A protein has these predicted regions:
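Mid-chain, well-packed structural core segment of small domains
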Residues: 62-95
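Conserved catalytic cores of phosphodiester-cleaving nucleases, focusing on short active-site segments
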Residues: 20, 39-65, 69, 77
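Acidic-basic catalytic patches of nuclease active cores, encompassing PD-(D/E)XK
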Residues: 1-30
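Acidic active-site catalytic centers that drive phospho-/nucleotidyl reactions
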Residues: 13, 38-40, 53, 73, ...
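Domain-level recognition of nuclease-like catalytic cores that cleave nucleotide substrates
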Residues: 87-123
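Short acidic/glycine-enriched loop/turn segments that link adjacent beta-strands
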Residues: 35-37, 107
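Hydrophobic "anchor" residues on beta-strands that sit immediately upstream
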Residues: 26, 49, 94
Length: 123
């Protein structure tokens, strides 16, 4: 992975976490890792546990960042979320999946929150 891609991802995650905190979310964990992969942000909004995937782009050439969260990515995030809920003994806790799309453009950055971006995908 190139340094530019890593810095784009890190910058996007920083902006996303700040945006979520300002929107009333409480950040519980960042970059939660398990054997199935990583979730960018785990947060709480009220009683709901929110698993957040952050997608960042430095250009609009490849389309909107949130379009990168396709079915296979949703399955992977779902598997990681299930592992998290089991590990933390939170299986009965209401949970959902949000996506934060961050555009890091020369004219400035834009952050878009998509609540309930997808359902639990186990296929």
């Amino acid at each position: 992975m190139s340094l530019m891609r890593i810095s784009t991802g890190k910058r996007g995650e920083e902006l996303a976490a700040a945006y979520l905190a300002e929107a009333g979310y409480r950040i519980v964990e960042r970059n939660y890792r398990c054997i199935f992969g990583e979730i960018d942000i785990v947060a709480e909004e009220g009683e709901t546990l929110v698993f957040v995937e952050v997608k960042s782009r430095r250009s609009e050439a490849y389309g909107d960042p949130q379009l990168a969260v396709g079915y296979e990515k949703q399955k992977k995030i779902s598997r990681i979320a299930m592992h998290y809920l089991e590990e933390k003994r939170l299986r009965r806790r209401p949970a959902r999946f949000d996506v934060v799309a961050v555009k890091l453009l020369p004219a400035g950055h834009r952050v878009e929150l998509i609540r309930n971006a997808f359902e639990l995908t186990c296929g």
